[in-house]
Regions:
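Transmembrane beta-barrel strands of outer-membrane/channel proteins
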Residues: 43-51, 103-107, 152-156, 178, ...
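Residues on the lipid-exposed face of transmembrane beta-strands in outer-membrane beta-barrel proteins
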Residues: 47-51, 67-73, 87-91, 137-143, ...
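Cleavable N-terminal export/targeting peptides
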Residues: 1-42, 58
Length: 283
């Protein structure tokens, strides 16, 4: 059995993410904007295909359907309400500019030992058992700058979780970084998000741990990671507004695992990437 708990193991990645976030924010022009509602209600639906690892750290890649739903309702007195899939529900409270606070309700789909893909099912995690899905609750605080937005958001499972014959308690994680949107032309927009993720011990165990029961059923060694920095992630997206109501979007996501996540027996690749392509219709 391997157990790790190093509270200082995420210090240097955090400094990196803060420095990179500030550099990216200062590099973008002042007219970059993140709010796509334009003060009016909107509904966007779309779908396409996504390709990526089966889970963070996996060397097995597969194609998955990509679905996108987003409804935005700005109000004068109550802030802005957003419902999106797969992100969840968001309420941006009013009257705090240039700072902001948003209440969040999300969803963690868990992880199956047999993962469904467009090609069928992958049995790489057979014997690990299923991690049940759960609702997430949390909040985000952010600082809107002329050329981007710095944010910190935290989410926690709404119930205790069980995995591999053990009770994990409530899983929780914290993300901190910067998001920007840069209009390259009247029809082309470049979006970027750079952030680091910290997980509590329960969340790390759910994602990268191996219990004694799981070790007995699989080829993976027992492993109990500690809480700490989990990964650093960069997302880049390009949206082409083909018609006033029609758009195409594509992008990539790349991550680097750090700390105990790198050393998990479930981790085959410490750096991973994925891509997506969607067609969107906006009402």
């Amino acid at each position: 059995m391997t157990t790790k708990d190093n509270p200082n193991s995420f210090r240097h990645p955090v400094m990196f993410i803060i420095g990179a976030a500030l550099a990216l924010t200062l590099a973008l022009p002042a007219h970059a904007a993140l709010d796509d509602s334009n003060g009016t209600p909107s509904v966007t639906v779309g779908g396409g295909i996504a390709v990526g690892p089966l889970y963070e750290g996996s060397s097995h890649y597969a194609a998955f359907p990509s679905l996108k739903l987003k409804a935005v309702l700005p109000t004068e007195d109550w802030g802005t309400f957003t419902a999106a899939f797969p992100e969840g529900l968001r309420w941006d409270l009013p009257g705090l500019a240039p700072f902001g606070v948003a209440l969040l309700i999300g969803y963690d789909q868990g992880r199956k030992e047999r993962i469904h893909t467009l090609d069928g099912r992958d049995d790489y995690l057979k014997g690990m058992g299923n991690l049940d899905s759960t609702a997430l609750v949390g909040a985000e605080v952010y600082w809107v700058l002329p050329n981007g937005r710095l944010f910190v958001r935290g989410l926690q499972s709404s119930q205790n979780r069980n995995y591999g014959g053990e009770s994990l308690g409530r899983t929780a994680y914290l993300e901190a970084g910067v998001a920007t949107a840069y209009p390259l032309s009247s029809t082309l927009t470049l979006d970027s998000t750079l952030y680091g993720t910290w997980s509590n011990e329960n969340d790390m165990m759910a994602r990268f741990g191996v219990t004694a029961q799981q070790a007995a059923r699989t080829r993976f060694d027992e492993y109990h990671p500690g809480g700490g920095m989990r990964d650093v992630t960069l997302k880049l997206g390009l949206t082409w507004q083909w018609q006033p109501q029609l758009a195409l979007e594509g992008g990539i996501k790349t991550y680097a695992l750090v700390s105990d996540a790198r050393d998990s027996p479930l981790t085959d690749e410490k750096v991973g990437a994925g891509a997506y392509l969607n067609a969107l219709y906006r009402f």
